[in-house]
Regions:
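N-terminal Rossmann-like NAD(P)+-binding domain of SDR-like oxidoreductases, especially those catalyzing
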Residues: 1-170
Length: 170
């Protein structure tokens, strides 16, 4: 698999291989503008920390809370830009995207913000649709509305998106 330094599923991750992969990733992300939505969540915080370590100029989009606390990326606060806002509020998303449009490079966007707990989605369907569908739509529409040219946009999902797959049909 060329996207992982030639490593396939059966490859051994040696220290040298990991070092080479870090070098390749640093070449790709060092000094580059990167937006991470959901940056203080489980996946987002790990990605944000890795990108900061690689030298990226990270813009961490974090849901505004009454406390303003950063639970998972607080230790990185001096090494990145944090934007507290709500993806379901198109105006705040527009503000962010307008600002990103002034970046000297084409930003990478990792859209990880979501209501990710499946059980919670059954108990709070409206909030789930707002966060996962409307929030994503607002982000994408703002990118289009402001003519933001991206290097790449990646989103994350879960296996739950596919439903239950019977073994025979898999």
């Amino acid at each position: 698999d060329a996207s992982m330094g030639g490593l396939g599923a059966d490859s051994v991750w040696t220290e040298a291989t990991i070092k080479e992969l870090r070098r390749e990733l640093a070449d790709a992300y060092a000094g580059r503008t990167v937006l991470v939505t959901g940056a203080d969540g489980f996946m987002g915080s790990h990605l944000t920390e890795a990108l900061v370590e690689l030298g990226a100029n990270v813009v961490a989009f974090v849901r505004a809370t009454s406390s303003g606390a950063l639970n998972n990326i607080g230790h990185l606060r001096h090494r990145l830009r944090v934007v507290f806002a709500d993806l379901t509020d198109k105006t705040s998303v527009d503000y962010l995207i307008r600002d990103l449009a002034t970046a000297r490079d084409r930003p990478y966007v990792f859209h990880l913000a979501a209501q990710a707990h499946v059980g919670e989605s059954w108990h709070r369907p409206y909030e789930t649709v707002m966060a996962n569908v409307v929030g994503t739509l607002n982000l994408l529409q703002s990118i289009v509305d402001h003519g933001l040219e991206l290097e790449k946009l990646d989103t994350a999902g879960t296996s739950e998106e596919y439903g239950n797959v019977r073994e025979a049909g898999a």
